[in-house]
């Protein structure tokens, strides 16, 4: 371990030399690198006895910090198999000498501890070397488990599996115990107590020996004095010679005299039982890739894997700086550098011409264009600000055009949040590496979404990949409904943190103005927001930042040991100039804003702080303050007992009950009769009554008024009343008439049987699909709970999926992964994919509607009157699509595959506040979207 003040240019501590027997007492000049020592402010670390936080050395020169430390189990799974073998020198003994054989096949990697908590203690005890021999560039010092290359990324630190500890060993101690029985050299010289297993003694295993696990430390011994050896560590090498219980005594006996000896230990958390079997290797590999990508160590590999896919982002200027033509002078930034992107880069003049010419001719800005490259259609989205143009191009088969437009707007929003403006982001050369990392993550999410969505079950993984088309670009964050008593506990914990009126956070503690004012915080659990005390604009910007940097899937998939992110941000809501001329209106103070993100296990706490105003003004590039980090981490530790209750809520499906689409497969002749009597089509004026084609059919219908609708007819699509035929067919509490028909036609399936068995395990509600005769057996309270949980009316639950967006609060509600995982089936999985892609198209229509409404409101002189009149004339907008589907891989050639029809309906509410609802339900439903929206949004509060 080395003093943080003496570091190489990359911020790493030099390695300890192997032999320090001839220590020199001269003090070297301390290079006080302005990086770590001055960037992180630790108010409590004023005395020499205080310990530095482990993340302090990771603070960058601009004050930013990204520190990731996975939990013990996650880090162990991320270690490559090649590192589990001790690549050290081997030793064999002859009668008179020790022969050390170097392992030429594999080079020994030096491991060095990452945590530097005991730096000052070791220095005060003169246990640190006074002279460091710098290695060549090929020897990179400590090797991160996330990086297998020579160049380390500044600001990213993770725990190591191995650590080197230098201790002073004096063989003369043996003379003091000469009269006694022969003692173990490991205890006398090193101060480590190791107890051989009873099974080894009994069986007489002496071939290779057992691992030297530290079971205890001798008081006053060299190991205890070092302060780095812990109980549970495993001694694997002495001066790069691998040791076991069989040869440790002979290796130590070869030490000629008093000297410094390097001991290599395997950290206690990395010790794993020998009988443990490797599990989920594929998942671990994907998780490893996710963490590598997040830390920026896989940018080259990511670019290499997508070289053949045309994709690009460019930031161009429409105003040339000089009259002399210069190659690529209009290009301020582009990524990536590949042959496929080079073709898009070479035609950038077309994009500039379209942007300039169409705007001058039509008076409107161009939003997108399409072209073919290597036989593939490429969509290009435009975003123009003043005389600059941001272009993002992606293949049409990977990213639909509406999604690309939303992604481009999200990129611009996030970059403004991080750098203040697009010019500040792209026009500063020092930001180029950060932008490369940003867009490597962006294109990875766009081109390979499955790599970032790693879940325990394949159905949940498919759900993540399918829903990302819509959910990743909504102006909000996924919200988890919680019971009131649990919500109160979370609110109380965040309120205590935000009050900042205790101990070091209080102004009276140091008799000085506090460094920052906590404006608010948001708490996430497994990617769901469970509590928030931030306004909507801040929530949307912080959630977009977390999505772009894959923080939400990271917390959902892995147990984080510690995550600390600190950076200056520019929230547009606080920095935009005030439009109100009233002098008494609230004015935002002229301050600076910082984002602190602290992660622990599956929790992630985002805190927005303000410097200036009531707090002290920030100067330079301040790093994270230890006190605020510790208090945020203490808040997460305080919520340890709540974690199990949140897990129960996730498993209890807090939202409306859902049904599986595979349960509704009907015979084709029965389906043909019900098409002409569809409740939804019956309410439309002049619906199309053409015969349905065998393939998937979609019927678009325009907006219609709620007041003009006729009373909803009774359910027709079921074909029979509840309870009919119950004497001949034994209906279980979890079957329906549609299910019985399906089983009679297709002889049943193992998937449905397994699904019905899974549904029986949910004892909180009888069955969200159909009650049948069991409805009579329910108590009045159980029936009331069931009706509250069922979003649709009627005897059967016909709701397949839903997404409710609350734009005022910046949240959306959708079924949890656990709910979707319980509804298996090939038809239902295809339904989920169609639903999100269809909703993406419907929402694009809604966005155009909002733009038109906004222009109408602004064109009138009286803004308020116009807005109110528009809202009263068009309170809602609705759009929907009718799908027909059949099971895939239908093998029975004699029978026609069953057909199921379902609606995907979106509804836009403008009054009293903007809301969007997207639902997917069976064609037989007699519900209307406004009724379902009222049930879903009623009582929804943060």
Swiss-Prot record:
One of its GO terms (cellular component) is ciliary basal body. Keywords: Cell projection, Cilium biogenesis/degradation, Cytoplasm, Cytoskeleton, Developmental protein, Phosphoprotein. It comes from the Eukaryota. It is found in: Cytoplasm; Cell surface; Cytoplasm, Cytoskeleton, Cilium basal body; Cytoplasm, Cytoskeleton, Microtubule organizing center, Centrosome, Centriole. InterPro entries: CCZ1/INTU/HSP4_longin_1, CCZ1/INTU/HSP4_longin_3, CCZ1/INTU_longin_2, INTU, PDZ, PDZ_sf. Residues 1-13 have a biased composition (Basic and acidic residues). It holds the Pfam family Intu_longin_3. Belongs to the inturned family. This is Protein inturned. The modification Phosphoserine is found at residues 674, 678. Residues 22-32 have a biased composition (Acidic residues). PROSITE patterns: PDZ.
